[in-house]
Regions:
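RNA substrate-binding interface of SAM-dependent RNA methyltransferases
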Residues: 1-110, 171-182
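Generic hydrophobic-segment detector
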Residues: 25, 85, 125-129, 159
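Short, well-ordered alpha-helix to beta-strand connector turns
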Residues: 40, 102, 128, 148-149
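Short secondary-structure transition/capping segments
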Residues: 55-59, 119, 164-165
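Long, charge-patterned amphipathic alpha-helical coiled-coil/hairpin "stalk" segments used as oligomerization
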Residues: 107-144, 154
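Structured adenosyl-cofactor binding patch, chiefly the S-adenosyl-L-methionine
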Residues: 138-183
Length: 183
């Protein structure tokens, strides 16, 4: 069983300072659609600010019970996997309750580091509940990465340019780990 947590704090800003980023509607919609397509159990939007969580809840509410459900039922269905939470600890707690065991925590980063887990290695070991942790802004702060069990290798295309949006990275990660393909 796979979970995704989209963490908004603590993350880096473009200057390398620790910050809190804002929740965006694009991230919510696109990551929910990818999560539902690939059978992710839950997508957690993790944000410490009550006001930012209210924004996310309002967006979700429009699609769950508001006019959005009738206007675009597929979008409404995709968003059903999404939960808003104040901390990564609460997301982990919820996933643990659902599965009966703490998920393997997998940090993501765009930086290559020694000891990272490859997509192939992780794909072969998805027999335990697993939580992929995505960072917004310019990536997860060390305090989040350090508490994870594994760090996933970066996504690289054929060029040296490596600056994907978090929602594009999330979709690629879902496909590489859960997609139907012959290996």
């Amino acid at each position: 069983m796979m979970f995704i947590s989209l963490v908004h704090h603590p993350v880096y800003d473009r200057r390398g300072n620790i910050q809190t980023s804002s929740i965006t509607t694009f991230d919510i919609h696109d990551l929910a659609r990818s999560s539902t397509t690939y059978g992710v159990e839950r997508l957690y939007l993790v944000h410490p600010s009550p006001l930012q969580r209210q924004v996310a809840e309002r967006i979700l509410g429009f699609w769950e019970v508001g006019g959005g459900k009738e206007w675009n039922p597929l979008r409404s269905q995709a968003l059903e996997v999404t939960r808003v939470t104040a901390s990564l600890d609460l997301a982990i707690e919820d996933a643990t309750k659902l599965t009966g065991e703490k998920p393997v925590l997998v940090a993501t980063t765009a930086k290559t580091k020694e000891g990272q887990t490859t997509f192939g290695q992780l794909r072969k070991n998805l027999d335990r509940p697993t939580m992929i942790i995505l960072g917004t802004g310019w990536g997860l702060a060390p305090e989040v990465i350090d508490r994870c069990d594994l760090v996933l290798e970066p996504i690289w295309g054929p060029t040296e340019f490596n600056h994907l949006s978090v929602r594009a990275a999330g979709a690629i990660i879902c496909d590489r780990l859960l997609g139907k393909r012959n290996i």
